[in-house]
């Protein structure tokens, strides 16, 4: 009887908070013990949106009894329970440790219709040396989680830079894209080594992205741009003086060199809907790139996305060629360079001036 009275009071309180005609929750005792009616009502926008068709909604939050090195995450999911194997690696790649989780089935009653969604409530450990201000990092983390969940961003440990370096998910995609290009251009270090180096020196990683952004931000005037780039180069060089490991120093310097060798990018462009373009593209001057094998093209364009990446090599302002699919994921640039060299030989023996008769 006492339990029934408690449940009745919870439901009564929740109904009092809800507008007339609003959906009502059908939840079990475990949910009622975990969340107050006020907390449940505060979540109704996410609950109803998920029940009405959105695949997933999330919220990072901190309970009153949690310290600054703890955080919680609510995942509202439409289509049944999300496996831990999908949630945990994503969160670990953002830098969190997962300490516990609770799962609740929530019935959303609207008229005679009841839709059931799932709530995963997860408790997280915040990385050491990170003071996580939810007002600042909350939106960035939610954006990153959803981008990875929907497959528009790679699920790897480059994403730790969101917390470590104070970047957003698209900023991190730029650093990841340069790492992919460095792999093709002959750097001897693995992607794991590169991401670990950036994570170890997050202030330098942030400066490298700022160097990229300052070089191409259309809002900057030319004088302001040159002054900003000069200041950033000095700051980065000073910071590199504190990197004792030679391999890490080389990795970071190759990043700086790749950014300095970039002539154009589509990073600041928007699509027809006003959203950032899904693919990143960088146009390089190969003569400026360190470590690039010969022969060096006149220009080189690198395109990167979560599902495809590639290079376009051209040895002159006017060039002809075609598209080719490669299954050599680790060194497709070497394959493309070989094809371009063969085309150069063909072009050398083609008579440039000819005649035609009818």
Task: Please identify what each model-predicted range represents.
Residues 112-114, 340-343:
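Short glycine/proline-enriched loop/turn "hinge" motifs that connect secondary-structure elements
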Residues 1-96, 100-309, 317-328:
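Non-catalytic interaction/regulatory segments
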Residues 332-336, 340:
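Phosphate-interacting basic helix/loop segments used at nucleotide- and nucleic-acid interfaces
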Residues 84, 341, 353:
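Conduit-forming functional cores of very large proteins
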Residues 356-358:
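Conserved small/polar residues in nucleotide/adenosyl-binding loops
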